Amino acid sequence: MGENMTFNVHLKAVIGALTGLIFGSQLAYGQGPEDRMVYFGETHLHTVLSFDAYIFGNRNGPDEAYRYAKGEAISHPAGFEMKLDRPLDFQAVTDHAIYLGMLPAMHDPKMEASKHPISLELRKAKTPSDRLLGFQKIFALLQPGVEDDLLDMEIVKSTWSNIIESAHKHYEPGKFTTFIAYEYTSGPENQNLHRNVFFRGDKAPEVPFSRMVSSNPEDLWDWMDENRAAGMDSLAIPHNSNGSNGQMFKTETFNGQPFDAAYVTQRIRNEPIVEVTQVKGDSETHPILSPNDEWADFETMPYRIGSWDPSNVQGSYVREAYLNGLMLEKEGIENPFKFGLIGASDTHVGAGAFTEGNYWSKVGVIDANGKLRGSVPLDKPREDGSLYSDNNFQTWSASGLAAIWAEENTREALFDAMRRKETYATTGPRIKLRFFASADYDASMINSPDLSKQAYAKGVTMGSDLMLKDGQVPKFILWAIRDPYSSTLQRLQVVKGWVDASGKAKETVYDVACAGGVGVDLKTNRCPENNATVDLKTCKSSAPTGENELKVMWEDPSYNADEKAFYYVRVLENPTCRWSTWDAIRAGVAPRKDIASTIQERAYSSPIWIN
């Protein structure tokens, strides 16, 4: 074993021991909140049972997906091996409810569906272009008002039953958690309004609610409420607001009506968290919305889902939604946008690609290598002279993961944590992150061996409201530990949003802890540059400073008790190579100049709202 490998193994052992001490140990459900552990997992994944995944060559089913999450190797549709560097703690299979299980049936000569003309065409599809054409023909059947003589609800019902059975088979309480789950795929005019629906327990309705019933998410919530009344609790997680064309977080109902209290209550009850990062880009914010945030232009995917149509920025990003929620409160309307954050992959090959250096993208044989996904030049230019494939796969990301603080690794504990929004998102690395707030914290706590216990006892954690009395000022505790398999930490940041006395929404970003032990410049609220660099010929990183742990107690220097505000944490790693640069290096070509060569992996906490 070489010196670097020895160091890395030692580092992982040290960080593992440190993590156990400061982030709690696995104890029985029902003990104090300070005993909660952070669990990392996948909340958005497709198998052979999703119509698009099947068309794109995926033949991995739920069983294979769960085995992958537990650390086993499975095969990519292009034939190579996919394997995690370490197992996940939990996973949900979220196949599309629409046309659930239909594509395997259409390819089975024993099934009546195989005799349909579209089935015959799909069986002949071999090339990526053939498969995309087949996808378009199926997708055309999914539009409102289109007569569909192919869909067989008995197939949907039996497939759903098999998904539930697989989730039960792979559930190992305390070790590995599965959820009964699926994806609801509303998308009028390619405006993404998709949600993943999770059930708390071991029972679910006979058939999942799909866009074939309604494209209005409010009808989905009604269905969820009905099931909850019948003893089947669930929650929905919206995703890819960045591709919603402003529809996900618009400040009116689906049908254009003003919000009322009943709408807000129902939305929050059914959608407590939002997926902020995944393969189809990042939805935290956008440089148009946050021009003074130097890190806002991160993994920006500018299109509506499945098209080249631009997605309207307003109404499509979570930070703006948080601000709009405060604006609604200012107007006397309840806030429908008090949601927490989570990350996921949205893989369509049954296995999430969470690391830049081992990225296999999303849609099977359609984007299985650098040439297909636009990171490596084609063998010869296209007719228009372009050197790269005619798609927007180069805007996709090696992201993300869900992180949940829970008492134990069970369905009930993880679900309840999602319900209370004690969750955060990462773009892939397993960064451990805590965030607390209180008016009663004192400086001596920060180095206390029972910091977590005191922080919970005296305050609130991510996803919560902090209610203050007159004259009180909030103090915040931020605490991050690096993933030993990833880069070191560069900085801890607080993102603040508020509405001022004139009714104008405002935001700012504070650096609050810096690598190298240096202080924040109080004039700019920024850490000094640590001059971290990446060699684009080898992807070797060089950082004069970088931390395994960053921890700080912080007070807002501009706090105004008359202004409602939200705060959330963003932690940034030192720069590393983006997946597209890794593709180029392995192909022996220069990285593409019109896309980022490096990225800064990050984590986003759920906010704390100050009232």
Residue ranges of model-derived segments:
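Bacterial N-terminal signal peptides that target proteins for export
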Residues: 3-15
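Bacterial N-terminal signal peptides
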Residues: 12-26
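C-terminal functional module detector
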Residues: 29-62, 66, 73-117, 121, ...
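Aromatic- and acidic-residue-enriched carbohydrate-binding clefts of CAZyme catalytic domains
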Residues: 115-146
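Long, charge-dense tracts
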Residues: 198-200
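Conserved, charged catalytic cores of large soluble enzymes
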Residues: 203, 213-218
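Long, hydrophobic alpha-helical transmembrane bundles and adjoining juxtamembrane helices/loops
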Residues: 208-209
